[in-house]
């Protein structure tokens, strides 16, 4: 028993200070002391906001408060936790690998703007290029007939200049 506690302490001390501080402020239920109820055994930080990665609604004013950790800081913490193999100890966040994989499976490899009836914006010259080149190709294919007709009618009587 004492050996496992020593190992856990040694593992905790091997974590980087930022991750260690975070886990001390917001300990997950899995590392609480034996017999402690997660609902009653809370740190002052957890009482203020149970999940520091999610926005909270003020109980009196009803106003929403930003998360304690910004998305950038969340991503940094998740990366640190992944490097040290303690990612499952973090509270829920959109930056967790499981959440990213779930979203990727749910939405697929979609690109915004390529749905049914949607076009990828692009520049106007890029969007009209295909139609313009097709029109040019048709004009080039019709060119021998146009030249023959021009030679027959002559310069003076020619009225069908291509627009």
UniProtKB/Swiss-Prot annotation:
Pfam families for this protein:
Mitoc_mL59
The UniProt entry lists the main location of this chain as: mitochondrion
Question: Where in or outside the cell is it found?
Answer: Mitochondrion
| Chain residue ranges for the region called Disordered | 33-53
Tell me which UniProt keywords the record has, alphabetically: Mitochondrion, Ribonucleoprotein, Ribosomal protein
Report one GO cellular component.
mitochondrial large ribosomal subunit
MF term (GO), any: structural constituent of ribosome
Give the family from UniProt. Answer: Belongs to the mitochondrion-specific ribosomal protein mL59 family.
Subunit (UniProt): Component of the mitochondrial large ribosomal subunit (mt-LSU). Mature N.crassa 74S mitochondrial ribosomes consist of a small (37S) and a large (54S) subunit. The 37S small subunit contains a 16S ribosomal RNA (16S mt-rRNA) and 32 different proteins. The 54S large subunit contains a 23S rRNA (23S mt-rRNA) and 42 different proteins.
Summary of the function given for this chain in its UniProt record: Component of the mitochondrial ribosome (mitoribosome), a dedicated translation machinery responsible for the synthesis of mitochondrial genome-encoded proteins, including at least some of the essential transmembrane subunits of the mitochondrial respiratory chain. The mitoribosomes are attached to the mitochondrial inner membrane and translation products are cotranslationally integrated into the membrane.
UniProt name for this protein: Large ribosomal subunit protein mL59
């Amino acid at each position: 028993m004492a050996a496992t506690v020593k190992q856990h302490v040694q593992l905790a001390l091997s974590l980087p200070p930022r991750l260690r501080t975070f886990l001390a402020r917001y300990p997950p239920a899995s590392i609480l002391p034996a017999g402690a109820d997660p609902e009653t055994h809370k740190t002052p930080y957890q009482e203020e906001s149970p999940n520091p990665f999610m926005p909270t609604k003020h109980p009196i004013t009803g106003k929403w408060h930003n998360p304690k950790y910004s998305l950038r800081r969340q991503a940094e913490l998740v990366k640190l936790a992944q490097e040290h193999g303690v990612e499952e100890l973090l509270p829920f966040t959109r930056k967790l690998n499981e959440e990213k994989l779930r979203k990727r499976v749910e939405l697929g490899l979609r690109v915004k703007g390529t749905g049914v009836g949607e076009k990828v914006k692009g520049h106007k010259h890029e969007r009209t290029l295909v139609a313009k080149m097709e029109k040019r190709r048709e004009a080039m294919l019709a060119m021998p007939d146009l030249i023959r007709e021009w030679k027959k009618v002559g310069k003076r009587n020619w009225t069908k200049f291509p627009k």
